[in-house]
Amino acid sequence: MNDKSVLSCRNLSKSYDEGPQSVQVLSGVELNLLPGERVAIVGSSGSGKSTLLNMLGGLDTPSAGSVWLAGEELSALNETARGLLRNRALGFVYQFHHLLPEFTALENVCMPLLIGRTPIAEARQRAAELLERVGLGHRLSHKPAELSGGERQRVAIARALVNRPQLVLLDEPTGNLDQHTAQGIQELMLELSRSLQTSFLVVTHDLQLAGHMDRILRLEEGRLIAA
């Protein structure tokens, strides 16, 4: 891997057994992501984009090949070490926010910090500052059910960034939002990526969002190619 890479994979493949047959989803995927770089992955539904993102984030195991995150080869780590690395170096944003419904916006954003054993007072301060930055300083004590769809996604973005990760993986981050709200979320993500120098890897069907990235890659027949 490139020593400067935030994320790298080599010859990454994934297949599933369906009865007596083996279905190849990904084949020989190669990717290198540099600090502060923003990359979009596009492709048809069912092409394996989410599967690839899960393997790059250490949430799924490849059938072959290797993934390096922040200089660590994921396959060389045990489950506990992988979890700690994910919490430290990665943020995740999904199409659905996956906020914990019983906790407030502030408490949801605090979670990655508390998992990393940040003192509670510091965690709350950092979470509040980031929620202010995403325009939700007045909604700290609101639970997800009391927030709009766009507000929930802003909380999810704040949660992904609160640990100051090197990389954020985003799976259709605007896919569940109306066009106006999606535009606001898109502008917020780009501003935060630039100002925090955080790398973004975005899986999306939104070609407008993809067009704002530094590079666009297409997943086609199990391989990544330049779009």
Swiss-Prot record:
Its EC number is 7.6.2.-. It is found in: Cell inner membrane. The keyword Zinc does not apply. InterPro entries: AAA+_ATPase, ABC_transporter-like_ATP-bd, ABC_transporter-like_CS, ABC_transpr_LolD-like, LolD_lipo_ATP-bd, MacB-like_ATP-bd, P-loop_NTPase. Gene3D superfamilies: P-loop containing nucleotide triphosphate hydrolases (3.40.50.300). It is a peripheral membrane protein. PROSITE patterns: ABC_TRANSPORTER_1 (PS00211), ABC_TRANSPORTER_2 (PS50893), LOLD (PS51244). Keywords: ATP-binding, Cell inner membrane, Cell membrane, Membrane, Nucleotide-binding, Translocase, Transport. The keyword Transcription does not apply. One of its GO terms (molecular function) is transmembrane transporter activity. GO terms for cellular component: plasma membrane. It comes from the Bacteria. ATP binds at residues 43-50. GO terms for biological process: lipoprotein localization to outer membrane; protein localization to outer membrane; transmembrane transport. SMART domains: AAA. Residues 7-227 form the ABC transporter domain. The complex is composed of two ATP-binding proteins (LolD) and two transmembrane proteins (LolC and LolE). Belongs to the ABC transporter superfamily. Lipoprotein translocase (TC 3.A.1.125) family. Part of the ABC transporter complex LolCDE involved in the translocation of mature outer membrane-directed lipoproteins, from the inner membrane to the periplasmic chaperone, LolA. Responsible for the formation of the LolA-lipoprotein complex in an ATP-dependent manner. This is Lipoprotein-releasing system ATP-binding protein LolD. It comes from Pseudomonas aeruginosa (strain ATCC 15692 / DSM 22644 / CIP 104116 / JCM 14847 / LMG 12228 / 1C / PRS 101 / PAO1).
